[in-house]
Amino acid sequence: MIELGARMGGDCITTHLVPLSTGIDMVKATIQIALGECPSIAPRFDKGAAIRYIEETNGVIENISGIDKVNSINGIEHVVLTKAVGDVVNRISSSVDRIGYVISQADTAQAAIDLCENAMKHIVITTK
């Protein structure tokens, strides 16, 4: 064994995508396990969830548009920006370098992917 990380998955997998696609609260289940309790991990439903990360070229953010439009799309559950106008954007070398992300939920995985892909078309980030 090289490494063992007894933790929840990152990049919104256990905090957002699993609950949106199955109804399972992974955070609660993890806490229950830590307390020696037996968590309920039976799926409550079967849906699709997807995430797309916002990427941009290097530079300083001059403008961000389209967020209100994306927030109004049915099935878009979360739009998160981690950078703002005036922030420096560098080449992505880790999760903390991301500008933000969009998460969707739909009846199928493909429909959720399509929602995210459509949402990304509306987000415009200008850098200099």
Locate the predicted segments by residue.
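Short intrinsically disordered coil segments
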Residues: 46, 66-72, 117-121
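Glycine-rich active-site loop/lid that clamps phosphate-bearing ligands
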Residues: 54-88
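Active-site lining segments that contact anionic ligands and/or coordinate catalytic metals
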Residues: 46-51, 74-76, 96-100
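Active-site "cap" helix and flanking loop/linker of ATP-utilizing ligase/carboxylase catalytic domains
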Residues: 5-65
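Short secondary-structure transition/capping segments
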Residues: 25-40, 77-97, 127-128
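Generic C-terminus detector
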Residues: 84-128
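Active-site flanking residues adjacent to catalytic metal/cofactor-binding acidic residues
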Residues: 2
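Generic structural signal for individual residues within well-ordered alpha-helical segments
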Residues: 28, 71, 110-113
